[in-house]
């Protein structure tokens, strides 16, 4: 049973958080929502979620992977938080699963984990990914070792299996 952190804050894309959260649970894994604080967070379309933990109360060593959902505001806020960046960077350094959906590539850019690695993203941040040194592929899904990128939430159902 894997323990996967889903890191999000206000402005998350609901489908990109809710689908992996429940799909992991259905497969027998433990999924938790980690945020910048303990207050409820509001998604892009108004869905409210109460985080399980706040980022400064967790350690990457206790998790088997991390997923960062997109939306435009969510990753923009997350990439400004040192604890989030350290968490994602440490998970990557431990060769554990790092999933980024849509605009979440911004968090991986700021975590310094995509240079010289294959990646994809929502088309609007393609230049950001390339300028950060990613080997960008215009594809729905890109896997490079422990990194899994999805360019848009609509393809989640097709490929987020996490070896379940």
List the model feature ranges, each with a label.
Residues 101-103:
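Short, thiol/selenol-centered motifs that function as redox-active sites or metal-ligating centers
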Residues 1-94, 98, 107-113, 126-138, ...:
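Extended, subdomain-level signal for the structured scaffold at the beginning of enzyme domains
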Residues 116:
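Exposed beta-strand and adjacent loop surfaces of beta-rich binding modules
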Residues 119:
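Anionic-ligand binding patches
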């Amino acid at each position: 049973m894997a323990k996967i952190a889903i890191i999000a804050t206000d402005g998350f894309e609901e489908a990109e958080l809710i689908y992996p959260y429940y799909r992991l649970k259905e497969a027998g894994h433990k999924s938790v929502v980690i945020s910048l604080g303990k207050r409820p967070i509001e998604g892009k379309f108004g869905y409210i979620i109460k985080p399980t933990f706040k980022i400064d109360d967790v350690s990457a060593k206790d998790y088997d992977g991390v997923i960062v959902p997109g939306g435009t505001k969510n990753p923009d806020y997350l990439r400004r938080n040192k604890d989030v960046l350290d968490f994602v960077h440490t998970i990557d350094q431990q060769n554990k699963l790092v999933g980024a959906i849509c605009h979440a590539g911004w968090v991986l850019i700021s975590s310094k984990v995509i240079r010289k690695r294959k990646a994809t993203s929502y088309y609007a941040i393609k230049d950001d990914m390339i300028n950060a040194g990613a080997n960008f592929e215009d594809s729905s899904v890109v896997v490079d070792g422990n990194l899994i990128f999805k360019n848009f939430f609509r393809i989640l159902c097709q490929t987020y299996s996490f070896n379940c």
